[in-house]
């Protein structure tokens, strides 16, 4: 599933062809999606000018001069394509601009979603109501984590994946940040000292910034809007590296909890 760096990279890639441009055509191409498109999407978006693009957690935001915000989630396999050579069966949404550019939202597994929300109602949009602070913003601090995790007996990894505590983190980058900080993923969250949480916040930011710089991590379907892959997988410290040596020489291990793989070094992470 695309995580924060992949969504941020996608948003940045969509800005050049979309920002400041008027949509001359909006076509929804499938009615049997898991989450159907809003019935009035074409009516409200056709003719609108895109005034800005942003991100909240793992959601992309496309703002218009009409006060609407198109909120998209890439699901498991979604990605945007700029000027595709052809529109395929998995291109479920197609946008055309007054500059003659074509953008398509391709989602083979159909777990993604598109919603249309009034800008003034965005904070109350269902998935956004209980989101925690953005990990790259000023509100995520060691003090915030200390307060949110106080008394919690759940593993730190599970807590970091809870979007109510930190918005946008996913499996890859939590594994990487915990390894960088030297915290075992099974450590009970409420027992971690404030100083270690301060370092954890720094590690989260460092990992995410590096991933965005590399264009995210391509696993199967993800690619940037221009078709380029994400190359952060070449920098993974532990994720996806079961049986390979950590930088300390210890063999990296994998455990499975709730169907999700966790990668860690038993020596470096305590």
UniProtKB/Swiss-Prot annotation:
<dbReference type="Pfam" id="PF06831">
    <property type="entry name" value="H2TH"/>
</dbReference>
<dbReference type="InterPro" id="IPR010979">
    <property type="entry name" value="Ribosomal_uS13-like_H2TH"/>
</dbReference>
<comment type="function">
    <text>Involved in base excision repair of DNA damaged by oxidation or by mutagenic agents. Acts as a DNA glycosylase that recognizes and removes damaged bases. Has a preference for oxidized purines, such as 7,8-dihydro-8-oxoguanine (8-oxoG). Has AP (apurinic/apyrimidinic) lyase activity and introduces nicks in the DNA strand. Cleaves the DNA backbone by beta-delta elimination to generate a single-strand break at the site of the removed base with both 3'- and 5'-phosphates.</text>
</comment>
<dbReference type="InterPro" id="IPR015887">
    <property type="entry name" value="DNA_glyclase_Znf_dom_DNA_BS"/>
</dbReference>
<feature type="zinc finger region" description="FPG-type">
    <location>
        <begin position="237"/>
        <end position="270"/>
    </location>
</feature>
<dbReference type="InterPro" id="IPR035937">
    <property type="entry name" value="MutM-like_N-ter"/>
</dbReference>
<feature type="active site" description="Proton donor; for beta-elimination activity">
    <location>
        <position position="58"/>
    </location>
</feature>
<feature type="active site" description="Proton donor; for delta-elimination activity">
    <location>
        <position position="260"/>
    </location>
</feature>
<keyword id="KW-0511">Multifunctional enzyme</keyword>
<dbReference type="InterPro" id="IPR010663">
    <property type="entry name" value="Znf_FPG/IleRS"/>
</dbReference>
<comment type="similarity">
    <text>Belongs to the FPG family.</text>
</comment>
<dbReference type="GO" id="GO:0140078">
    <property type="term" value="F:class I DNA-(apurinic or apyrimidinic site) endonuclease activity"/>
</dbReference>
<dbReference type="InterPro" id="IPR000214">
    <property type="entry name" value="Znf_DNA_glyclase/AP_lyase"/>
</dbReference>
<dbReference type="Pfam" id="PF01149">
    <property type="entry name" value="Fapy_DNA_glyco"/>
</dbReference>
<dbReference type="InterPro" id="IPR015886">
    <property type="entry name" value="DNA_glyclase/AP_lyase_DNA-bd"/>
</dbReference>
<feature type="binding site">
    <location>
        <position position="109"/>
    </location>
    <ligand>
        <name>DNA</name>
    </ligand>
</feature>
<dbReference type="GO" id="GO:0034039">
    <property type="term" value="F:8-oxo-7,8-dihydroguanine DNA N-glycosylase activity"/>
</dbReference>
<dbReference type="InterPro" id="IPR020629">
    <property type="entry name" value="Formamido-pyr_DNA_Glyclase"/>
</dbReference>
<feature type="binding site">
    <location>
        <position position="152"/>
    </location>
    <ligand>
        <name>DNA</name>
    </ligand>
</feature>
<feature type="binding site">
    <location>
        <position position="90"/>
    </location>
    <ligand>
        <name>DNA</name>
    </ligand>
</feature>
<keyword id="KW-0378">Hydrolase</keyword>
<dbReference type="GO" id="GO:0008270">
    <property type="term" value="F:zinc ion binding"/>
</dbReference>
<dbReference type="InterPro" id="IPR012319">
    <property type="entry name" value="FPG_cat"/>
</dbReference>
<protein>
    <recommendedName>
        <fullName>Formamidopyrimidine-DNA glycosylase</fullName>
        <ecNumber>3.2.2.23</ecNumber>
        <ecNumber>4.2.99.18</ecNumber>
    </recommendedName>
</protein>
<keyword id="KW-0456">Lyase</keyword>
<dbReference type="Pfam" id="PF06827">
    <property type="entry name" value="zf-FPG_IleRS"/>
</dbReference>
<keyword id="KW-0863">Zinc-finger</keyword>
<feature type="active site" description="Proton donor">
    <location>
        <position position="3"/>
    </location>
</feature>
<dbReference type="GO" id="GO:0006284">
    <property type="term" value="P:base-excision repair"/>
</dbReference>
<keyword id="KW-0862">Zinc</keyword>
<dbReference type="GO" id="GO:0003684">
    <property type="term" value="F:damaged DNA binding"/>
</dbReference>
<keyword id="KW-0326">Glycosidase</keyword>
<keyword id="KW-0479">Metal-binding</keyword>
<feature type="active site" description="Schiff-base intermediate with DNA">
    <location>
        <position position="2"/>
    </location>
</feature>
<comment type="subunit">
    <text>Monomer.</text>
</comment>
<keyword id="KW-0227">DNA damage</keyword>
<keyword id="KW-0234">DNA repair</keyword>
<keyword id="KW-0238">DNA-binding</keyword>
């Amino acid at each position: 599933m695309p995580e924060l760096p992949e969504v941020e990279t996608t948003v940045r890639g969509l800005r050049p062809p979309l920002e400041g441009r008027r949509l001359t055509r909006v076509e929804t191409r499938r009615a049997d999606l898991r989450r159907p498109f809003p019935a009035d999407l074409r009516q409200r978006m056709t003719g609108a000018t895109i005034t800005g693009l942003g991100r909240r957690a793992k959601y992309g935001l496309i703002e218009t001069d009409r006060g609407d915000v198109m909120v998209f989630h890439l699901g498991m396999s979604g990605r945007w394509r700029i000027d595709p050579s052809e529109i395929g069966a998995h291109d479920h949404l197609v946008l055309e601009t007054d500059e003659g550019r074509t953008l398509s939202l391709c989602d083979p597994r159909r777990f993604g979603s598109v919603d249309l929300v009034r800008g003034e109602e965005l904070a109350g949009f269902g998935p956004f109501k209980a989101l925690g602070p953005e990990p790259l913003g000023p509100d995520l601090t060691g003090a915030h984590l200390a307060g949110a995790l106080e008394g919690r007996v759940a593993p730190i990894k599970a807590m970091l994946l809870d979007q109510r505590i930190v918005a946008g983190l996913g499996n890859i980058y939590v594994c990487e940040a915990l390894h960088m900080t030297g915290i075992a993923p099974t450590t009970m969250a409420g027992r971690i000292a404030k100083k270690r949480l301060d370092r954890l916040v720094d590690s989260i930011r460092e990992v995410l910034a590096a991933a965005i710089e590399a264009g995210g991590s391509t696993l199967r379907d993800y690619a940037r809007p221009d078709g380029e892959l994400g190359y952060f997988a070449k920098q993974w410290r532990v994720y996806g590296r079961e049986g390979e040596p950590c930088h300390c020489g210890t063999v990296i291990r994998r455990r499975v909890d709730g169907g999700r793989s966790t990668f860690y070094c038993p020596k470096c992470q305590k």
